Amino acid sequence: MSDAQDSRVGSMFGPYHLKRLLGRGGMGEVYEAEHTVKEWTVAVKLMTAEFSKDPVFRERMKREARIAGRLQEPHVVPIHDYGEVDGQMFLEMRLVEGTDLDSVLKRFGPLTPPRAVAIITQIASALDAAHADGVMHRDVKPQNILITRDDFAYLVDFGIASATTDEKLTQLGTAVGTWKYMAPERFSNDEVTYRADIYALACVLHECLTGAPPYRADSAGTLVSSHLMGPIPQPSAIRPGIPKAFDAVVARGMAKKPEDRYASAGDLALAAHEALSDPDQDHAADILRRSQESTLPAPPKPVPPPTMPATAMAPRQPPAPPVTPPGVQPAPKPSYTPPAQPGPAGQRPGPTGQPSWAPNSGPMPASGPTPTPQYYQGGGWGAPPSGGPSPWAQTPRKTNPWPLVAGAAAVVLVLVLGAIGIWIAIRPKPVQPPQPVAEERLSALLLNSSEVNAVMGSSSMQPGKPITSMDSSPVTVSLPDCQGALYTSQDPVYAGTGYTAINGLISSEPGDNYEHWVNQAVVAFPTADKARAFVQTSADKWKNCAGKTVTVTNKAKTYRWTFADVKGSPPTITVIDTQEGAEGWECQRAMSVANNVVVDVNACGYRITNQAGQIAAKIVDKVNKE
């Protein structure tokens, strides 16, 4: 039976009139559809019965779709809505005119280096925006990259890959195609971070330059072995004419250890841009400029002015020595009662109403999709049906104008983000990074007494002696990897990281009955990359401690601390620790990084909210002014 005969073209699915089958794969089908209630044309993905009935997949898909729907970046094809009709799960997405990068490479072969860099730069912009919002893609590959005729690139299928287990993909026979781009840590029990997306992007860069993925094999086992232990291929050795500088770019992007990779997708894209010759850098800039100008909407005409005027974690006793981690029983609680802690950041109420056709439908983030070209293809959903129209075919559609204010705001947002992306890519010579902060400047970065008192809500906190070495106190933590989430500047935490110097201060009110305690430290590393890598590693360990209780043994005394959820992601992370049986005594840990300096702060008291985060931010500001 042909694709056309076996499709649901012409039928209704809830409020959607399915007009054209765009693609088919192991997870389901993609249709061009008209939303008959809201009168716009979209892409609708219908999941197979196997996936729709899988409770794990259903919950993951809903969660990831809600997160991915928040992304507002020109190179991201957003999810507008999700839900189910008669037990079948679906996703509604913007319809985009384009063909997937995999088809382009198979039909035309490798891209020129400038064109490859232009496309990687756009996808890096999408990934960095997602990572900043705490969203990982997990399935970056040519099939999930759409290219328009003017080389404007989109990254699709946010949330789908992460909703699907690798075992499920294996059962569907699609794992080998996906595993060509999987980072080594995805084949182990190690935590998978956003740097897995950077690894995959480096694999895509390799394929754009050479026409082939880095590793090719007939079995998933061979692919896994190559990613884990195989040498990283050199594009210049595979295809003559590729600048040798790309070998180093791909090697770092595909580093076996996540901490050895680029700190962001944008860093990888910038390195790829710098690997081009000067004429090719200009060519890549021209491609980016042309794609932006042809795809992003023009600014709205100015509105005439109105004719009428507008209507108007520390112990409660000082540690001995001063750098001893917190652990001593605090003094009695003050007479006031601490206020309730605020709810988790980003918590959103559920939808207030849902149409009868989709009882579990997800919230719509906006009143309708941003008007865009009308063809969607790819996303790992298989090739278009045989005999279908040209991928550049235009299909008339009904329009539903956006309100003027919302439209103008969207246009401004897209233009600003687009302009930033162009500027980064087309500058002829990159701005030189700042010189590393010298060790003798570390003490000047710490907050003085008045600054610490202002943040902590005190008036009498005073600093102790300067700290110039890591704390090596004989402290035992039941979960050793959580020691850094509990205490500042710990020798076991920093040992072997390559740091070069530390400077810190402990501040509190005089005497034994202090109500506030702060340990602030700044740690110098040889390079900014090493400092960022340390913070990323710390973030991974802290997240593994969230919700857990640890037992601390310090000088023959035992204490128990419970970790809340970690907030933020590198470059800044925070977590609150509560001491058991200490009448509300809490500490907030904060860690951040600027240039080659790691900022390490612990702020303790009875009314802890984000004091450590504020202190860290103020220190970062000082580092950036150096």
UniProtKB/Swiss-Prot annotation:
<feature type="domain" description="Protein kinase">
    <location>
        <begin position="16"/>
        <end position="276"/>
    </location>
</feature>
<feature type="disulfide bond">
    <location>
        <begin position="587"/>
        <end position="604"/>
    </location>
</feature>
<feature type="compositionally biased region" description="Low complexity">
    <location>
        <begin position="343"/>
        <end position="355"/>
    </location>
</feature>
<keyword id="KW-1015">Disulfide bond</keyword>
<keyword id="KW-1003">Cell membrane</keyword>
<dbReference type="Pfam" id="PF00069">
    <property type="entry name" value="Pkinase"/>
</dbReference>
<keyword id="KW-0418">Kinase</keyword>
<feature type="binding site">
    <location>
        <position position="45"/>
    </location>
    <ligand>
        <name>ATP</name>
    </ligand>
</feature>
<dbReference type="GO" id="GO:0009274">
    <property type="term" value="C:peptidoglycan-based cell wall"/>
</dbReference>
<feature type="disulfide bond">
    <location>
        <begin position="482"/>
        <end position="545"/>
    </location>
</feature>
<dbReference type="InterPro" id="IPR008271">
    <property type="entry name" value="Ser/Thr_kinase_AS"/>
</dbReference>
<feature type="compositionally biased region" description="Pro residues">
    <location>
        <begin position="297"/>
        <end position="308"/>
    </location>
</feature>
<dbReference type="InterPro" id="IPR000719">
    <property type="entry name" value="Prot_kinase_dom"/>
</dbReference>
<keyword id="KW-0723">Serine/threonine-protein kinase</keyword>
<dbReference type="GO" id="GO:0045926">
    <property type="term" value="P:negative regulation of growth"/>
</dbReference>
<comment type="function">
    <text>May regulate bacterial growth in response to external signals to facilitate adaptation to the host environment. In vitro, phosphorylates several substrates such as EmbR, DevR (DosR), DacB1 and Rv0681.</text>
</comment>
<keyword id="KW-0547">Nucleotide-binding</keyword>
<dbReference type="GO" id="GO:0005524">
    <property type="term" value="F:ATP binding"/>
</dbReference>
<feature type="modified residue" description="Phosphothreonine">
    <location>
        <position position="170"/>
    </location>
</feature>
<dbReference type="GO" id="GO:1903338">
    <property type="term" value="P:regulation of cell wall organization or biogenesis"/>
</dbReference>
<keyword id="KW-0346">Stress response</keyword>
<dbReference type="GO" id="GO:0004672">
    <property type="term" value="F:protein kinase activity"/>
</dbReference>
<keyword id="KW-0067">ATP-binding</keyword>
<dbReference type="GO" id="GO:0006355">
    <property type="term" value="P:regulation of DNA-templated transcription"/>
</dbReference>
<dbReference type="GO" id="GO:0005886">
    <property type="term" value="C:plasma membrane"/>
</dbReference>
<dbReference type="InterPro" id="IPR026954">
    <property type="entry name" value="PknH-like_Extracell"/>
</dbReference>
<dbReference type="InterPro" id="IPR017441">
    <property type="entry name" value="Protein_kinase_ATP_BS"/>
</dbReference>
<keyword id="KW-0808">Transferase</keyword>
<feature type="region of interest" description="Disordered">
    <location>
        <begin position="292"/>
        <end position="396"/>
    </location>
</feature>
<protein>
    <recommendedName>
        <fullName>Serine/threonine-protein kinase PknH</fullName>
        <ecNumber>2.7.11.1</ecNumber>
    </recommendedName>
</protein>
<keyword id="KW-0472">Membrane</keyword>
<dbReference type="GO" id="GO:0045893">
    <property type="term" value="P:positive regulation of DNA-templated transcription"/>
</dbReference>
<feature type="topological domain" description="Extracellular">
    <location>
        <begin position="425"/>
        <end position="626"/>
    </location>
</feature>
<feature type="active site" description="Proton acceptor">
    <location>
        <position position="139"/>
    </location>
</feature>
<feature type="topological domain" description="Cytoplasmic">
    <location>
        <begin position="1"/>
        <end position="403"/>
    </location>
</feature>
<dbReference type="GO" id="GO:0004674">
    <property type="term" value="F:protein serine/threonine kinase activity"/>
</dbReference>
<feature type="transmembrane region" description="Helical">
    <location>
        <begin position="404"/>
        <end position="424"/>
    </location>
</feature>
<dbReference type="InterPro" id="IPR011009">
    <property type="entry name" value="Kinase-like_dom_sf"/>
</dbReference>
<keyword id="KW-1133">Transmembrane helix</keyword>
<dbReference type="GO" id="GO:0106310">
    <property type="term" value="F:protein serine kinase activity"/>
</dbReference>
<feature type="compositionally biased region" description="Pro residues">
    <location>
        <begin position="316"/>
        <end position="342"/>
    </location>
</feature>
<feature type="binding site">
    <location>
        <begin position="22"/>
        <end position="30"/>
    </location>
    <ligand>
        <name>ATP</name>
    </ligand>
</feature>
